[in-house]
A protein has these predicted regions:
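Positively charged n-region of N-terminal signal peptides that target proteins for export
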Residues: 1-4
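Short, solvent-exposed secondary-structure junction/capping segments
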Residues: 41-42, 54-73, 77-80
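Surface-exposed, charged secondary-structure patches
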Residues: 32, 76-139
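Short beta-strand edge/turn micro-motifs at domain boundaries
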Residues: 126-128, 140-170
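Bacterial N-terminal signal peptides
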Residues: 7-17
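Short, low-complexity N-terminal intrinsically disordered segments enriched in polar/charged residues
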Residues: 20-59, 172
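Non-catalytic cap/lid and distal C-terminal segments of serine-dependent acyl enzymes
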Residues: 46-47, 61-62, 96-98
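A mature extracytoplasmic/lumenal domain signature
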Residues: 56-59, 67, 129-133, 162-163
Length: 172
């Protein structure tokens, strides 16, 4: 019995080893999407409304923030005037309103992005990342952000943006 077992073990040892999984070079779609993320960040820093708007499929995309319960409570508690509308947990907007408010601001604005995850089949994609919104050196808010993208004849475009936000409880 020992002889046949040894022969099998010996034969198996000469078989080619299974291919090991190595990190693959990024595919072209992922590289293009990563460049889109960089252009998003650069347009905010440069207060480039036209460049920012070119990143989107159209102006009326889904654009929603979900604030943490604590952020909503703090904001509403800070309001002294009872006629000012109270904040809600989920708020909408648009990419144009966002970039135009940044462009009007006299202060430097930026969005730091980390832990970027891109999932794509080459036609549609999801981008998921951690962000911190900065006003100068002050970390104003942070959370998770998700984009839905589509590949058009003009390249990748953002079709929806949804994010969570924790507002900084400490003022600047």
């Amino acid at each position: 019995m020992r002889g046949p077992l040894f022969a099998v073990v010996l034969a198996v040892s000469f078989l080619p080893a299974p291919r090991l999984a190595y990190a693959q070079a990024p595919d072209p779609a992922r590289q293009e999407i990563a460049r889109l993320v960089e252009r998003f960040q650069k347009a905010i820093i440069a207060k480039d409304t036209a460049g920012f708007m070119q990143l989107f499929l159209r102006e009326d995309i889904t654009w929603n923030v979900v604030y943490t319960d604590d952020s909503v409570k703090r904001y509403n508690a800070s309001l002294k005037d009872p006629t000012i509308p109270r904040a809600t947990k989920i708020q909408g907007g648009s990419p144009r309103r966002f970039i135009e408010s940044i462009a009007r601001s006299g202060q430097a604005r930026s969005e730091t992005i980390s832990n970027v995850r891109i999932d794509t089949d080459g036609e549609v994609a999801q981008v998921w990342f951690d962000f911190a919104f900065m006003v100068g050196d002050y970390k104003s808010a942070w959370g998770k952000e998700s984009w839905q993208l589509v590949r058009t004849g003009d390249g990748w475009k953002i079709a929806a943006v949804v994010w969570s936000a924790e507002e900084n409880p400490q003022g600047p």
